[in-house]
Amino acid sequence: MNSKFIVIEGLEGAGKTTAREAVVSELQRHGINDIIFTREPGGTPLAEKLRELIKQGVEGERVTDSAELLMLYAARVQLVENVIKPALARGAWVVGDRHDLSSQAYQGGGRGMDAGLMNSLKQAVLGDFAPDLTLYLDVTPQIGLQRARARGELDRIEQESLNFFTRTRERYLALASADSRIKTVDATRPLEQVTAALQQTLTQWLQEQR
């Protein structure tokens, strides 16, 4: 089977780290062992510096929505061109913590940025490049933020309003319903049930790829 790019998406507190472990375990069970991990924003030296700016901001200066969006795409193109595409070319599988769907949901939905701008930027930066499979972990903003707060101090984006995350989730769900490559998993359930659902979804998808 050819190498694939699998992305895990969801709101803060959706359980992406646990999901990654479940995905890797299932891939290994199917004999896939050459796997690399990526995260967005980040994943290269430049992208990691941009991650810090995006998540923490700069003291005394407001980060505009447009600046945030452009930094995200700058980090993304560095990761895609310098890490993800080379890994796929050599036959490795890539499991990513977030990708472009996050921008479509957070900036397009949460921030309410212009859809035309979002699509133009996506096309200019990524072209036709897209994940082979996206696993969207769906949680309500209330549950997600409760889990995120339990982890400790919140970053700049995690401190956004409940309405922001409600809009973000609505955009996630709308995008998922319109794209068969995005599989939605109910992540409000107990961990064991979420893990089982992820593994079942991934197994079925892998069988379809053969």
UniProtKB/Swiss-Prot annotation:
GO terms for cellular component: cytosol. Its EC number is 2.7.4.9. Signal peptide: none annotated. GO terms for biological process: dTDP biosynthetic process; dTTP biosynthetic process; dUDP biosynthetic process. Keywords: ATP-binding, Kinase, Nucleotide biosynthesis, Nucleotide-binding, Transferase. Gene3D superfamilies: P-loop containing nucleotide triphosphate hydrolases. InterPro entries: P-loop_NTPase, Thymidylate_kin-like_dom, Thymidylate_kin_CS, Thymidylate_kinase. The keyword Kinase applies. CDD domains: TMPK (cd01672). SUPFAM superfamilies: P-loop containing nucleoside triphosphate hydrolases. GO terms for molecular function: ATP binding; dTMP kinase activity. Phosphorylation of dTMP to form dTDP in both de novo and salvage pathways of dTTP synthesis. Belongs to the thymidylate kinase family. This is Thymidylate kinase. The lineage of its organism: Bacteria, Pseudomonadati, Pseudomonadota, Gammaproteobacteria, Enterobacterales.
